[in-house]
């Protein structure tokens, strides 16, 4: 079993592991929420370089919360800003228009209250876009340790390798690794699966 954190437009390496390990993958829902991590932050490539897209969450008076209980805040009109950032970054990529309508629903449609639900629904849609079966299994309880591969720190180092692929701004910045799945999807479209397969390090 592999345990991953819930992630907003998760890094490409997460999807490589989901493709390779399928139903062995679980998403952690019981851990204490860790702010400013993949749980509420995606990294995309822009004309100026890397850009963080961070979902604001409601605070709980400094008390620790389980990931499954974290609510999204509507502060700052973030949905509109994130969609505008994605559009600006990828509107000239080969496959943006192909996937834009399905992706826009998450930013222009009915708001989702909980961060975990939003991340999982977005993950399921991205998997459908990629044409891959996606594990949507959640952990049943919190386990500090056990017979599983613990990737809750958000790193897939040692299990995935960096595989360069076409990026719109590569002529300015070179290849930027470790980005959100949105970067791979909008740049490579159906060929994204080939990149994900190449990323897996055989054990």
Q: What is the predicted function of each stretch?
A:
Residues 1-203:
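Residues lining hydrophobic/aromatic ligand-binding pockets adjacent to catalytic sites
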């Amino acid at each position: 079993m592999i345990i991953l954190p819930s992630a907003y437009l998760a890094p490409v390496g997460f999807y490589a592991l989901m493709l390779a390990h399928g139903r062995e993958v679980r998403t952690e829902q019981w851990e204490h929420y860790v702010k400013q991590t993949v749980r509420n932050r995606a990294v995309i490539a822009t004309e100026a370089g890397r850009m963080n897209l961070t979902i604001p969450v409601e605070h709980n008076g400094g008390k620790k919360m389980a990931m499954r209980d974290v609510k999204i805040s509507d502060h700052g009109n973030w949905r509109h800003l994130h969609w505008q950032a994605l559009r600006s970054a990828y509107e000239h990529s080969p496959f943006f228009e192909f996937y834009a309508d399905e992706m826009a629903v998450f930013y222009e449609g009915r708001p989702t209250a909980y961060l975990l639900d939003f991340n999982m629904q977005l993950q399921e849609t991205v998997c459908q876009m990629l044409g891959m079966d996606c594990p949507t299994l959640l952990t049943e309880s919190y386990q500090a340790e056990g017979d599983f591969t613990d990737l809750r720190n958000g790193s897939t180092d040692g299990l995935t390798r960096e595989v360069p692929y076409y990026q719109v701004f590569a002529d300015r910045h070179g290849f930027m690794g470790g980005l959100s799945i949105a970067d791979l999807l909008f740049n490579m479209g159906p060929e994204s699966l080939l990149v994900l397969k190449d990323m897996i390090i055989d054990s």
